[in-house]
Amino acid sequence: MISYSSIAKASLKDVWEHFIYKIDNPQHFVPGVSNIIIKEKNDDYVIRQMNIQMKDGPKNKVVEKITSVPYHVKFEIIEHLVFTVHVDNFAEFISEKETKVTYAMHWKNKATGEMQTNETIIKDAVLKTIAFIEGY
């Protein structure tokens, strides 16, 4: 598992609202996302399909099952050619104007069993999320 945390200059309520918005609009939060399709949505989960273009890598189609409870959103990839993956997004109250944002990524290569350890991926996603929340 790799994780990264940073502080958003926003209330917990604002961060949480952006986390929920991210379910339907990941392109504002995750680098390299395109062709987003919400395949199913109910009170318990969302099934989302999209393409992700990794930096200097191939474009991959992924299908995710997304669940959310305050203040945690879990993105579990249920269709990916190379990896088994789940990513957790956490929001933690710091003060009325600051919230700790943490992403934890559990990526495992299906063929080799090797865990993904590229911390730049998760750091870039957290920083892009915070920049969007803060309006940059």
For each of these PLM feature ranges, what is it?
Residues 37-80:
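Glycine-rich portal/gate segments that line the openings of hydrophobic small-molecule binding cavities
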Residues 76-128:
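Beta-strand/loop substructures that line and gate deep hydrophobic ligand-binding cavities in soluble
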Residues 1-43:
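Hydrophobic ligand-binding cavity/cleft-lining segments
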